[in-house]
Amino acid sequence: MEIRSDDGARVRIRPVGYQPGIDPPDDPERAAPGWQDWLLIEVDARTADGQTWSHHYPSLLVEEARALSSWLHGQAIAAAGPTPPPAMVRFTEPNLALRTRAIRRRRLELTVEFSAESLPPWMRRPATAVYPLLLTVSADALTVAADQWAGHCEAYPPRTRSRFPVDGPLPHRRRAG
């Protein structure tokens, strides 16, 4: 998916495969949830002032990746309401987190937080370092990104049973707009 901000900043995030070196379980029904389901995530980011970086890292479990689409859809829908509360989603690996804050009706500030192996190369890397990439986006653009992300995730079905229902921990919602 690609999300572009009004100020020229952008982020592209997509799954590019299962974590290398981890074979699928012989019996998916008996395997512990998650271990074989790490996805290699490719990130390409650009700040508003033109600094760029990219990386590949096994950052999300399949179920987390699928749940992200529902979360993004939910944020787009909430932005249509009068005063949606700020929201955040974190994952098992601390490389990525996302926050939203309503700016005005149907406009959001989406903060993509990078940490650990996902930090930009120009940052020092103490264990607690976080780099926030702020993106100002419309609810419609966030819906498009959620649909793109869901499409990317279809190529990577779970290889073990999930802790969540098929559509993830959040109910699938209709498109905003």
Task: State what each model feature region is.
Residues E113-G177:
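Mixed-charge, glycine-accented linear interaction segment located at domain edges/termini
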Residues S54-P58, P82-P85, T128-Y131, L135:
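Alpha-helical rod/repeat scaffolding segments in eukaryotic adaptors/tethers
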Residues Q19, D49-Q51, R104, S118-P120, ...:
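Residues that cap or initiate secondary-structure elements
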